Structures are given as C-alpha cells and as structure tokens.
Amino acid sequence: MAENQYYGTGRRKSSAARVFIKPGNGKIVINQRSLEQYFGRETARMVVRQPMELVDMVEKLDLYITVKGGGISGQAGAIRHGITRALMEYDESLRSELRKAGFVTRDARQVERKKVGLRKARRRPQFSKR
C-alpha cells in the first residue's frame, strides 16, 4: 500500500479505531469523511486533534482512520488512543511527552451492567414505608 505508513489501534468504551499515519500535509480522514463532516461537536474534534497538537505534527502527517462501535465521545477517545499509538510507532521519542499528557493509557472505564432487582446498575426501586 504505502511505503512508510505507521499504524495504531485505539479503544475506548465499546469503540475501536484503526489509525494509519503517513507523511503529508495534515489531512484527517475518518471512515472516508473529513473530521468536520464526521464529528459535529467541536469537543470531539478537539479530542481527536490533541495528540497531534501536543507534538506539533498537525501539518506534517496525514491520518486515515476507520472507527466502529460506540457513540461520539467513545469514538473520539478511541481515535485519540490510536493516533497516540501510531505516533509512538512513528517516533519512539514522543512517548514520554504523550505519556505525561495521559494519552498513552487506555481508559478502562466501561458501562457497569444492570443488576437483577435494580432499576439501573445501582439505582434501587423506590422504597415505600407503607
């Protein structure tokens, strides 16, 4: 496919992102759509751009991303994790900077399951004294 392409897998909640990085001019393509088309919310776009802005490579690399599962926030987090891993494969010296910002660690928080006899994961049914 490409001569010098770097890959990273990112996960968050129930989303999984595959990120390919190539030298270029800062184009970000997510599921064959631009970043602006894919994410309507500015916060999600900001989360995706964070690792690139941290290491000053916004205009130096092109990103090709496929993401599946979850919602907007989970997908944005998965993409950020994938970009971080791909950047570390591209240049290992960026690891400490990315680690300090907290992008390397996989956010392990998952939705807690609903339990039998409860209304939600922890919410109990209303108690009636009489």
Curated annotation (Swiss-Prot):
InterPro entries in the cross-refs: Ribosomal_Su5_D2-typ_SF, Ribosomal_uS9, Ribosomal_uS9_bac/plastid, Ribosomal_uS9_CS, Ribsml_uS5_D2-typ_fold_subgr
Gene3D superfamilies, per database record: 3.30.230.10
GO BP: translation
GO annotations of cellular component type: cytosolic small ribosomal subunit
A Pfam family annotated for this UniProt entry: Ribosomal_S9
Keywords: Ribonucleoprotein, Ribosomal protein
Molecular function (Gene Ontology), one example: structural constituent of ribosome
Similarity comment text for this entry: Belongs to the universal ribosomal protein uS9 family.
Record PANTHER family: RIBOSOMAL PROTEIN S9 (PTHR21569), SMALL RIBOSOMAL SUBUNIT PROTEIN US9M (PTHR21569:SF1)
HAMAP family assigned: Ribosomal_uS9_B
NCBIfam families: PRK00132.1 (NF001099)
Protein name stated in the entry: Small ribosomal subunit protein uS9
Organism, scientific name: Shigella flexneri
